[in-house]
Amino acid sequence: MTEEDRDEQFYRDTESVAFAKLDDHQLSLLEPIAQRRNLKRGDVLFKVGQRNLGLTIVLRGEIDVFEQRDGTEYVLATAHERDFIGDVSMLQGTSALATARITSDEAEILHVPASELRRALAEIPAVSKTIVDALIMRRRRLRRDREFAGFRVLAQSDDRYGHQIDDFLDKNHVPHRFIDFASEQGQGLSQRLHLTSRDLPTLIAATGSPLRRPSLREVAQVAGLLRPLARENETEILSDLTIVGAGPAGLAAAVYAASEGLNTVILESYAPGGQAGSSSLIENFFGFPTGINGGYLTWLAQLQAYRFGAKFSTPSQVLSLNYNGDSEYRACIEIEGCPATLRAKAVLIATGADYRRLEAENRERFEGVGVYYAATALEGQICRNETVVVVGSGNSAGQAAMFLSDGAKKVLLVIRGDDITKKMSDYLARRVQAQPNIEILYRTEVRKMFGDQRLEQVELENAKTGERQTVKTPAVFSMIGARPCTEWLPPEIERDEKGFIKTGADVAEAPAWRENERRPAPLETSLPGIFAAGDVRSGSVKRCAAAVGEGGMAVAGIHMSLASRRNGSPSKTSQQRTNRG
């Protein structure tokens, strides 16, 4: 079966879910919170780029949803009686990717405002399942649609930053295309928009407007990912819980906290999902007997948190945390580019860990153009019918090797040790060893990298024999572990010798706890009300399911911490203030 055949099969299999109609009972539940409107041919419901659209239900008439491609309208879908219009941008509050217009002489609709829609999806299960399942499936179909333009990244094929924009949009599940400037399509697009090589990389928004050499923050603003946390002229943002980091631990905490009524804000520096979001297939996650793509799993978790009212801001880089133990809002968080201060009653640190870099000559030259830290469909295209190198001996390396082996000619799994089973799960190690086009190179390291504009070959050395070999390859995948992202934290938050955050019994004798009437919760840090979960925490099990469990467990401790404050048993310590540096 060709890729086109698989796409056609996917569209057939998902059509009934993506375009489900609402029944009488569901309409009766939504009607009290909806506005009934009569429209005529040519009336526009919403335009591409608009935000906070709410839900439109067609009672009578016909509505086309279309996009503009280089001046021509292309209809994506036509809505009839009992159909509803939209995709997951309605949940997220991000920018509409298309325009909707009345095409019948007359039409009657029900419009559910965005604020009422979020409440309905959280509180009315009879409605939420049909709508949310459809919105998710529509986005999946849209991302798979080869004709849909969406956002377009125009760049040279070897432009490192252009590929970073591509990666950023991909990991944030924004439908987009990467277009090589030198291609026929790229040249035609650049001529129509009057772009030259000096303008690259350029992001062409779904509206058709070009954004020359944008920062990731500007990309996020155009895509609607960077949501304003504060209203204009506000100097403070208040939250019950602020979660820093949207990996599995942070996302799980967001779902539980928001569903339990806490005003929850999640700050993510790049894209939700963490390292799990970069995993092509997680096979040992509870409830998925055939495995699940890590990016898809964490995206669903993000949408689940949105449904319960959690507020995300991406990319939001936290610069510092100031602590005042005697205040109701004891944590003050400074965010890069945000004029307002975020104040929180409790904070969960779920920043995970950064990828470690290979100590190979010329490695810096090929970051993003040959050296990668995730194996997804984007990278898989580069590796098709090629020999590729994966470095590492843990589960991430094994999963990457298995995923790449499906399309690559050969996968060389390079490990420094002599036993693949020491760090890798047994089931995965056996699968890697049995895969015919995966070769494991024990006691081997990558020494040098070569290439012109992109990576072309690497030099490998056997540490035992000293023998060196040169391998022709377009890609090296580095899966050699990570270091905790804790440099922004104040020194009063205690860490172990490797920089991971101490919690629970390990901080019971910290100064802030010695004079406190209660003991720290299992995931609470050396500062009361500040929690840590997932890979950033000292002693945590570095697995996706474990991080999810810790996220949920942290929320239980947060409720206990907030209750102790309400009951009048705050810290007896005098005011403590901490900040970065």
Regions found by a protein language model. Give the residues of each.
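FAD-binding core/adjacent interface of flavoenzyme oxidoreductases
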Residues: 166, 188-244, 259-260, 277-278, ...
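Beta1-alpha1 glycine-rich phosphate/pyrophosphate-binding loop at the start
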Residues: 153, 157-166, 170-184, 193, ...
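A generic structural signal for short hydrophobic patches within well-formed alpha-helices
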Residues: 27, 117-118, 219, 318, ...
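Rossmann-like dinucleotide/flavin-binding elements
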Residues: 233-272, 359, 365-367, 373-426, ...
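A Rossmann-like FAD-binding core segment of flavoenzymes
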Residues: 298-344, 349-351, 405-517, 560-581
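Structural motif
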Residues: 62, 106-108, 328, 341, ...
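Cytosolic regulatory regions built on CNB/CRP/Popeye-like sensor folds
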Residues: 1-167, 171
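Short aromatic/basic micro-patch
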Residues: 21, 55, 78, 111, ...
